Amino acid sequence: PLVLAAAHIAGVDEIYRMGGAQAIAALAYGTATIVAVDKIVGPGNAYVATAKRHVFGTVGIDMIAGPSEILVLADKNNNPSWIAADLLSQAEHDVAAQSILVTDDEIFADQVVAAVAEQLPTLAKGDIATASWDRYGSVIVVQNWDEAVDLVDRIAPEHLAIALNDRDSEAMLERVRNAGSIFLGAHTPEPIGDYIAGPNHVLPTARGARFSSGLSVLDFMKRSSIIRCDAPGLAHLGPDAVILAEAEGLSAHARAISLRLNQSNPKTD
């Protein structure tokens, strides 16, 4: 009911109760009751991601979104329980989710690990979070924050939380290149971006932030190039285009231009 209410407020006029890889196939190819669409967006499990990969080309897709990820940069001035909760906020999504702490203080790292162990039994999805943390959770202690910049850009996390002082957070923000969404400061937990901050939280995973961005209105837009030459314009550009076409061995390309340069059109002249 909550999703239906939100859809009504947003002006959605068509809803299908379905999910999984079979829903992706139905949307891509159409059925007796579903008209095939042009583009499919949104995350899902491994089966949905695989299905989107298969139908790409028949329809457009936004991205191949995998299990959730978070990388937290935190110094010793943070509350270890807060940082532990940040890590577990992604671990509870999926047993394949990955939560990474990067800090410059070993004692603080141990405190966060202890806080994670304390919080895990209290979670509604504790079994999932425990499996995720045991398999893919990581704590990395760096000598300095310069090392952290390189790590972040190599990992290219879906979510990057920078829990440093204001000056260092801003400095880190200026240097980091690869992250799906960035959360600045100790009072900006990742879930605030999931639910209410504003930016879309459908984000690139599996290092996809190296070359792509989160879902936005731009994913629902496309562009067409519009080109018009008058006779003087073609006279200016045409000779160089002919040279390029001939260099490629595409004589029909060259002729389409040169005929217009060298012959008049009796129907318009």
Question: What residue spans do the PLM features occupy?
Answer:
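Conserved NAD(P)+-binding/catalytic subdomain of aldehyde/semialdehyde dehydrogenases
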Residues: 9-98
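Structural motif
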Residues: 13-16, 37-41, 45-47, 62, ...
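Short, ordered loop/turn segments at secondary-structure junctions
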Residues: 20, 45, 76-78, 104-106, ...
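Glycine-rich, charged/polar anion/phosphate-binding loops
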Residues: 55-59, 83-88, 145-147, 167-170, ...
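A conserved active-site cap/scaffold subdomain adjacent to cofactor or substrate pockets
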Residues: 63-135, 139
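C-terminal core of ALDH-fold dehydrogenases
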Residues: 145, 154-269
